[in-house]
From Swiss-Prot:
Pfam families: Hemerythrin, ScdA_N
Gene transcribed to yield this protein: ytfE
Positions of transmembrane segments: none
Name the UniProt record assigns to this protein: Iron-sulfur cluster repair protein YtfE
Major localization listed first in the record, in broad terms: cytoplasm
InterPro entries: FeS-repair_YftE, Hemerythrin-like, RIC_family
GO function terms (MF aspect): metal ion binding
Statement: the UniProt record of this protein carries the keyword Phosphoprotein: no
Family per record: Belongs to the RIC family. YtfE subfamily.
PANTHER family linked to this entry: IRON-SULFUR CLUSTER REPAIR PROTEIN YTFE
Length: 220
């Protein structure tokens, strides 16, 4: 099957660094992972032949880890340590930086107004979300009760969509997380941190939406 006919989520899992390429083109491979490459390329006005050629080059590299073959309990442990714990570190620091930038540069036309508010909303949303996963959903899956977790998984997927919407707002108020020429060191560091957080969050959501949840629902 041609790459253009495959879902973004599958491509992100099967081709090394495909997720970074999709981020470069602002394609949503986590919450929007079911859309085909052709559909995503059309929505973002990307030449399908060019991105297919780029994916073909990436596909020649060995894949680091195929999460589709990893036991669910190991995936869950990885998600908690690699993503949940990291988000809990990232967001409070980004909120502090945003508060400072909005205060010190309030008179600048390019200041990301409202960024502190949106980062705080994302922090609150994810804190509640991750706690529910760790206390309710993940134990169910580890106990082999994935088939009975349809309701909790549906709620988690909906909350992933809500987090994705907040990320879109954050990208909007930060000019796609691009610092203006007058940005100070803190401003630039904050935008680097936001980009890292978005990368982590998209990988996190993709691993749950496209691997963990479908396999759990299938009764693994």
């Amino acid at each position: 099957m041609a790459y253009r006919d495959q879902p973004l989520g599958e491509l992100a899992l099967s081709i090394p660094r495909a997720s970074a390429l999709f981020r470069q083109y602002d394609m949503d491979y986590c919450c929007g992972g079911k859309q085909t490459l052709a559909r995503a390329a059309a929505r973002h006005d990307v030449d399908i032949d060019i991105i297919e050629a780029q994916l073909a080059q990436l596909a020649e590299q060995p894949i680091e880890k195929d999460w589709r073959a990893v036991p669910l309990a190991d995936i869950i442990d990885h998600i908690v340590v690699r993503y949940h714990d990291r988000h809990r570190e990232q967001l409070p620091e980004l909120i502090l930086q945003a508060t400072k930038v909005e205060r010190v540069h309030a008179d600048k036309p390019n200041v990301p107004r409202g960024l502190t508010k949106y980062l705080t909303a994302l922090h609150e949303e994810l804190s509640s979300h991750m706690m529910k996963e760790e206390q309710i959903l993940f134990p169910m899956i580890k106990q082999g009760m994935g088939r009975q977790a349809t309701g909790p998984i549906s709620v988690m997927e909906s909350e992933h969509d809500e987090a994705g919407e907040l990320v879109d707002v954050i990208k909007h108020v930060t000019q796609n997380v691009t610092p203006p020429p007058e940005a100070c060191t803190t401003w630039k560091a904050m935008y680097n941190g936001i980009n890292e957080m978005i990368d982590d969050l998209m990988e996190h959501i993709s691993l749950e939406n496209n691997v963990l949840f479908p396999r759990a629902l299938a009764g693994e």
